[in-house]
Regions:
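Bacterial N-terminal signal peptides that target proteins for export
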Residues: 1-3
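Compact, glycine-rich, soluble single-domain proteins
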Residues: 17-172
Length: 172
């Protein structure tokens, strides 16, 4: 019995150890790189000068950590082939509108993505970080300043003008 009591006491004491402290270092918001490669994209009759995201690293970073998006700025994400896509608002500090485009540049779906508040210090712990799905095959995604899709009256099926051939050839 003394052995059992000793084991219970040991288990109780060892389970009370504090977890090591965790240092949370928030990401520092950044401004767009003025030297980033851009391309002109026309949405709803309005020209935008969008940064390119052609490879996995660029697509993963996307517009994360930005404090602002220029009125005519944003990013175009190009993929090698049409596929089901899903984007999240990871480390995003401003609202972003997303347009998913098929291989011909037609709008498949759009979303007004809102800033996600951290839960427990981490945005990814917030269930609202779940993906915004393309709901169909898409080869491109375009992200612009929040509110512009509605302001421009963009709808599913609309054509977005972008250098399709170049983007398809360069997507990795």
């Amino acid at each position: 019995m003394a052995l059992v009591g000793g084991l219970i006491t040991f288990a109780a004491i060892s389970s009370c150890k504090a977890n090591p402290p965790v240092t949370i270092i928030p990401p520092v918001p950044v401004e767009p790189d003025p030297q980033a490669e851009t391309v002109e994209v026309v949405i709803g009759g309005r020209a935008f000068n969008l940064e390119l995201a052609l490879n996995d690293a660029q697509r993963y970073q996307g517009l994360s950590d930005r404090k602002s998006i220029a009125e005519d700025g944003g990013m175009v994400f190009a993929f090698r082939y049409p596929q089901e896509l899903g984007f999240v608002m990871r480390r995003c500090y401003v609202p972003i509108d997303i347009l998913y485009l098929d291989e011909q540049g037609r709008v498949v779906s759009t979303y007004a993505m809102q800033v996600i508040e951290p839960v427990g210090g981490f945005r990814w712990q917030n269930p609202a970080t779940s993906p915004y799905p393309s709901n169909g095959l898409a080869q491109f995604a375009v992200e612009v300043r929040g509110g512009l899709v509605e302001a421009l009256g963009v709808e599913v099926g609309d054509q977005v003008q972008l250098p399709l051939k170049e983007l398809k050839a360069r997507a990795q």
